[in-house]
Amino acid sequence: MNSEQLLHNYVSDSLLTTLISFQEFKQQLQSYTSDEQQLQHWYELLQARDARVTSELEARIKQFFITLRSRLLRFLESEQLSHSLSLETLIDALYKINDLLQQRLQILDDAIQEKTSELAEFENMVRSPSAGDNAIPGLLQIIQSYINLLEEN
């Protein structure tokens, strides 16, 4: 049961003809008239009035909840907008991240290319048939540079 229905039931249950039966009504008004038809007519008039009041209250309750829902929706939308990023800001941030990643990737790619060239040069020195005693100092220098590089990391 929703809030609207709960409020409607609460108000409807508070109406006079809901609270007292015809018998109780008759007992309360017997001192004013003993004509049961007159009492029945009065009670029916009260029931008709309660039905009109119920109908009017139902319309007012519906309108109240429509207005309340509308206000809450506007409030939630404004709160959401105040705490969210615009699509443009998000796209700009993603482009900046992309640029940073591209720069870092280029640095890594350049380092890999440099090391690949050094290894290719080393391989050529080792496989060279002319690599004799005069190539050994160059090889030792390259090996020492790799040892230094490994010790730094």
Curated annotation (Swiss-Prot):
Belongs to the NKP2 family. GO terms for cellular component: kinetochore; Mis6-Sim4 complex; nucleus. Disulfide bonds: none annotated. Keywords: Cell cycle, Cell division, Centromere, Chromosome, Coiled coil, Kinetochore, Meiosis, Mitosis, Nucleus. Residues 86-128 form a coiled coil. Present with 1630 molecules/cell in log phase SD medium. This is Inner kinetochore subunit NKP2. Component of the kinetochore, a multiprotein complex that assembles on centromeric DNA and attaches chromosomes to spindle microtubules, mediating chromosome segregation and sister chromatid segregation during meiosis and mitosis. Component of the inner kinetochore constitutive centromere-associated network (CCAN), which serves as a structural platform for outer kinetochore assembly. Its main location: nucleus. It is found in: Nucleus; Chromosome, Centromere, Kinetochore.
